[in-house]
C-alpha cells in the first residue's frame, strides 16, 4: 500500500463524507471535463470504501457492547 493510501485511510468519517459531497457538486458542474470526472469518481470510490470501513467498525463495536449487556 502506498504512503498516500495509508494516509487516506486515516481520514475521519465526517471529513470523508464532506469531501464526497464536494465531489458530487464538482461532478454536477457542466464545466467539469470527462477526465476530471473520472479522477473525481476514483477519489469518491476510495472515500466510500473508507466510510464503509468506519461504519463496519462502529457496527462491530455496537454489537460488542450489546453482547456484553446481554451477558450481564
UniProtKB/Swiss-Prot annotation:
NCBIfam families: PRK00977.1-4 (NF002140), xseB (TIGR01280). It is an enzyme of class 3 (hydrolase). HAMAP family: Exonuc_7_S. Gene3D superfamilies: Exonuclease VII, small subunit. Heterooligomer composed of large and small subunits. Its EC number is 3.1.11.6. It is found in: Cytoplasm. This is Exodeoxyribonuclease 7 small subunit. One of its GO terms (biological process) is DNA catabolic process. Pfam families: Exonuc_VII_S (PF02609). It catalyses: Exonucleolytic cleavage in either 5'- to 3'- or 3'- to 5'-direction to yield nucleoside 5'-phosphates. One of its GO terms (cellular component) is exodeoxyribonuclease VII complex. Bidirectionally degrades single-stranded DNA into large acid-insoluble oligonucleotides, which are then degraded further into small acid-soluble oligonucleotides. One of its GO terms (molecular function) is exodeoxyribonuclease VII activity. Keywords: Cytoplasm, Exonuclease, Hydrolase, Nuclease. Belongs to the XseB family. It comes from Chlamydia trachomatis serovar A (strain ATCC VR-571B / DSM 19440 / HAR-13). The gene is xseB. Its main location: cytoplasm.
Amino acid at each position: 500500500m502506498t504512503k498516500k493510501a495509508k494516509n487516506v485511510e486515516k481520514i475521519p468519517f465526517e471529513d470523508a463524507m464532506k469531501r464526497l459531497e464536494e465531489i458530487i457538486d464538482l461532478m454536477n458542474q457542466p464545466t467539469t471535463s470527462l477526465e476530471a470526472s473520472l479522477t473525481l469518481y476514483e477519489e469518491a470510490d476510495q472515500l466510500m470504501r473508507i466510510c464503509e470501513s468506519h461504519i463496519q467498525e462502529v457496527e462491530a463495536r455496537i454489537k460488542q457492547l450489546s453482547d456484553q449487556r446481554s451477558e450481564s
